[in-house]
Amino acid sequence: MKKLVVIYSGGMDSFTALNKAVKEGFDVYALSFDYGQKHNKELIYAQNVCNELNVPHKILDIKSISTLFTSSSLVSDDINVPDGHYEADNMKSTVVPNRNMILISLAIGYAVDIEAEGVWYGAHSGDHLIYPDCRPEFVKVMDQASKVANFEPVYVHAPYLNTDKIGILKDGIKMGLDYSKTWTCYQGKEKACGTCGSCVERLEAFQANNIDDPVQYSI
């Protein structure tokens, strides 16, 4: 059985990717990160799912890097997480500079250590506009760099790179997944806000698939 590291935030995109990898027969190792995000509640969801799936899971504490990213509303207490759709200009404040390169680099190192052949992460087409490190050109060069950075080549793959959240949910429905086991909201409060870009995109995906979102919202 081929080993695979899946970067798993606890959100619906990486939740679907994680389950996809398990169902495809990979020996999956999940890796989550506490990088100082306001919505670190997602890590509880990630741990619970991995326990249910019997998937080895590490949560890496790298909160100290948040001091480098004071311009991001996801980690800075001085900036409010904006409401609205990802297409709005104010959503750029949710960018954590170089986040995916940092997280993927750590995942590659982990993959080399456990002799895994690849790293998956949950980038999708809905992220392309706002997040440069979710675009096809980034995935391509990160994959190339990974294969020359170590003696052991590790590939980097985003299984939903050319699919939006609507399509991801559609695939998850086919797999029979329970999305009450995911946390999407950037606010990290008791209930999902329903108004941040992440919530808006999630709600649109459920509406497009004609099913109810099992998560409770404060709106």
Curated annotation (Swiss-Prot):
Its EC number is 6.3.4.20. Binds 1 zinc ion per subunit. The keyword Nucleotide-binding applies. Pathway: Purine metabolism; 7-cyano-7-deazaguanine biosynthesis. Its cofactor is Zn(2+). GO terms for biological process: queuosine biosynthetic process. Belongs to the QueC family. This is 7-cyano-7-deazaguanine synthase 2. The gene is queC2.
